[in-house]
A protein has these predicted regions:
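Nucleotide-activated donor-dependent transferases that construct or modify glycoconjugates
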Residues: 1-9
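Redox-cofactor binding/interface segments in oxidoreductases and associated redox assembly factors
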Residues: 2, 80-81, 189
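Short glycine-rich anion-binding loops that position phosphate/pyrophosphate groups of nucleotides
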Residues: 5-6, 83-86, 157-159, 278
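ATP-dependent carboxylate activation and anion-phosphoryl transfer catalytic cores
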Residues: 9-13, 236-302
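Short acidic-glycine loop/turn motifs at beta-strand connectors
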Residues: 28, 40-42, 204-209, 267-268
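Short glycine-enriched loops at secondary-structure junctions
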Residues: 111-115, 215-218, 265-269
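Phosphate-binding site of ATP-dependent enzymes
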Residues: 139-140, 147-151, 158-248, 252
Length: 302
């Protein structure tokens, strides 16, 4: 089963959920798809109202709903948690619900681990590999940090896809205050001008570093997210990036995280450890012919 945003909201040309589902469908598995809002606990059973679906890259419409159904999810072999953040209370509630069946069904990523690993805050243990970074909502701390670093990126801790990211080149208490009011604790990071050359997204599957792509921001932008117009390219990782990636991959495996994406800018970890719904596998396949969806399911012994 796939727990995710409705297929009509997905772009099959880049979407990793579709890519993973299509691959397992080729192995004769049936795909059941549901929205997190349709997840319930009824008579002590975890059920979802959703539909069986078929994906096809060759058809004009890339999916076909076969049959709507209310399904007992404990009968599934695998469940992929694939809805986009924000990581809010609704997201957290779905992890608690799925926790109750995780001994019966293989859930990727493990719902307890998804809940425990804050995608930004988890990186605080890797700060020696990162540009100068603080997590705070204290105005004095943020001001001090800005004075020291001159150009600072402000990021919400629980958002995604480059949403609400600000580059601060002049300290603006009004703007910072507004940002804190909206997001509570925020991530402040020394700006790395080499972002204009692109970042690197590294894919980790079952504790192994499996591949990477680069994403180059469009002219005049600092955002390397493809959803914000960044252009993906093929890339090789440096030995330094591989070393850091392996350390994180080993830690994530211990934390029961099967699939993750981590990002580098200028050989520095940018602090996003993506464990909710990492993306980029379809793009890697289109650029290089490397099919990590095959690796993903092979590692799960599907």
């Amino acid at each position: 089963a796939v727990q995710g945003n409705h297929p009509s909201k997905l772009n099959p040309l880049t979407d990793t959920s579709v890519f993973l589902a299509n691959e397992i469908q080729n192995k004769q598995y049936k795909i059941f798809y549901y929205d997190p809002k349709d997840l319930s606990v009824v008579n002590s059973k975890v059920v979802a109202e959703g539909f069986f679906i078929k994906f096809s890259y060759s058809n004009k419409k890339f999916y076909k709903i076969i049959k709507k159904q209310n399904l007992d999810l404990s009968k599934c072999k695998f469940i992929l948690i694939r809805q986009d953040p924000p990581f809010n209370l609704e997201y957290i509630s779905t992890t608690y619900i799925l926790d109750t069946i995780k001994t019966k069904v293989k859930i990727i990523n493990n719902p307890t681990s998804v809940r425990n690993i804050s995608e930004k805050l988890y990186s605080s243990k890797y700060q020696k590999y990162m540009p100068a970074t603080i997590f705070s909502q204290n105005m004095d701390e943020i001001k001090k940090f800005f004075k020291k670093n001159k150009k600072v990126i402000l990021k919400p801790i629980h958002s995604f896809s480059g949403n609400d990211i600000h580059l601060l080149t002049k300290f603006n208490p009004k703007l910072v205050n507004k940002f804190i009011k909206k997001h509570d604790h925020i991530m402040c990071q020394k700006f790395l001008p080499k972002i204009s050359n692109g970042d690197k997204r590294v894919f980790i599957i079952n504790g192994k570093v499996c591949g990477a792509i680069s994403r180059v921001p469009k002219k005049g932008s600092i955002l390397s997210n493809m959803s914000k117009g960044a252009k993906p390219t093929n890339i090789k990782l440096t030995s330094k990036e591989i070393k850091i990636s392996k350390i994180i991959a080993k830690d994530l495996k211990k934390e029961n995280i099967f699939f993750a994406g981590i990002d580098f800018i200028d050989q520095k970890l940018n602090g996003d450890i993506n464990v909710t719904s990492p993306t980029g596998l379809k793009t890697l396949y289109d650029l290089s012919g490397i099919n990590l969806a095959k690796t993903f399911w092979k590692e799960l012994k599907a």
